Structures are given as C-alpha cells and as structure tokens.
C-alpha cells in the first residue's frame, strides 16, 4: 500500500501531490502514496481531491489534487516572475516554498507516506513569504 506512486511523480524535481477529502480532512484511500524505493520522500504535499466542484459537477481523483496544486503554483509564479519578486524561481525552489507553507496536523509526523510534508496551503505559503520579505 505504500509503493503506489509511479512516473512522473518519482522524479526529484516534480511536485508530487496526494489527495484528501477536504470536507473531513481524511486521506483519500485511492490516492497514491510513498515513500519511493530510491529514497526520495514523496508525495511532497496533499491537496483536496474528493468531491471537488467543477463546471460539470463534483469530481474525485488525483487529477483534481494535481489541478489545484498547479493553480497554486501559477499563483506563486505570478508573484515571483510577473511581479518581479523572484524572477529566477525554479522548480525546486517552488516546491520548497509549497512545502514550507504546507499546513500540518500536530498529531502527525512529517514527512509521511500519505500527506508528504502536509496539506497544500497557498495562503500559508504567501504568509511565510511575507515574513521573509520583512
């Protein structure tokens, strides 16, 4: 049950995301999980992936968590590149910011095989960035 991640999530630079149910904060049982046999800690973060509202109705799956994470990365890239805060931000730096801003449950140990370094929290990432810039 702990070796369900596959390519391309197994690469070092990829932001790998697992899925959880945002309604009750439970891990989605069909989500991929790590750690990897090559020693990499994956997933990096977890994002909502159960009953996500879309124009065609509610959808469940890792693709929903990936899409929400991609949207968060797009917001970060606007802040970094478009607004000239960090025009050289690369994939590893973006991943590090997402990890540092992740929301962690005090009853869990991080990183772990289901949640990675915690739940994706873009607000938390930007709050952390505002502290760094002061």
Residue positions per predicted region:
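Hydrolase catalytic cores
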Residues: 48-113, 119
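Short, hydrophobic-biased amphipathic alpha-helical segments
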Residues: 118-125
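Secreted peptidase-domain scaffold signal
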Residues: 125-134
